[in-house]
A protein has these predicted regions:
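Short, glycine-/small-residue-rich phosphate/pyrophosphate-handling segment
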Residues: 64-117
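Short, electropositive, low-hydrophobicity segments enriched in small/polar residues
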Residues: 35, 39, 45, 69, ...
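N-terminal beta1-alpha1-beta2 submodule of the flavodoxin-like/Rossmannoid cofactor-binding fold
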Residues: 1-62, 124-156
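Short, flexible, mixed-charge acidic loops at enzyme active sites
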Residues: 8-9, 112-124
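Glycine-centered flexibility motif
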Residues: 31, 79-80, 100, 120-121, ...
């Protein structure tokens, strides 16, 4: 049964302050690392809402040629990390951004028992929502960030 009335119980999303970004922040960035928790194999709704507001940047081509990478966290190893990373990448491809992943030259990628994918960095938080990265996750996350920074500097 669906109610005819709806009452907001959560506060509205703030319009400014960390970790929130504006369209001007995106327009002026030299590279973008975009992250979201996984929600049923997709990015979280607030990030989707924000990306849906970037049409003016898409129309102007403001993000074309800028490097970007994506990262996520899930509660379980098979919680939808790769589909989440892909769902975050699709709008960035539409913007003409240069998506960076993790190559298998990083041996941790093929040996990890926790997070890490070629599509982007990931973390398995577990059912206890552990915020601490495993050694493999930390190494791969730093490698992706380093890769993004290196490419952004080369393109600047």
């Amino acid at each position: 049964m669906v109610s005819a009335q709806c009452e907001a119980v959560d506060p509205q999303i703030p319009h400014e302050g960390p970790p929130y970004a504006t369209l001007d922040d995106l327009k002026s960035c030299h590279g973008l690392a975009l992250g979201s928790p996984t929600r049923f194999g997709n990015m979280a709704a607030p990030l989707k809402y924000f990306l849906d507001s970037t049409t003016s940047l898409w129309l102007s081509g403001a993000l074309v040629g800028k490097p970007a990478c994506v990262f996520t966290s899930t509660a379980s190893m098979h919680g939808g990390q790769e589909t989440t990373l892909t769902s975050m990448s699709i709008p960035l491809w539409h913007h003409g951004m240069l998506l960076l992943g993790l190559p298998y030259t990083h041996t941790e990628l093929s040996e990890t028992l926790t997070g890490g994918t070629p599509y982007g960095a990931s973390h398995v938080a577990g059912s206890d929502n552990n915020p601490h990265l495993s050694q493999d996750e930390s190494t791969l996350t730093k490698a992706l960030g380093r890769r993004l920074a290196d490419i952004a500097l080369k393109l600047k």
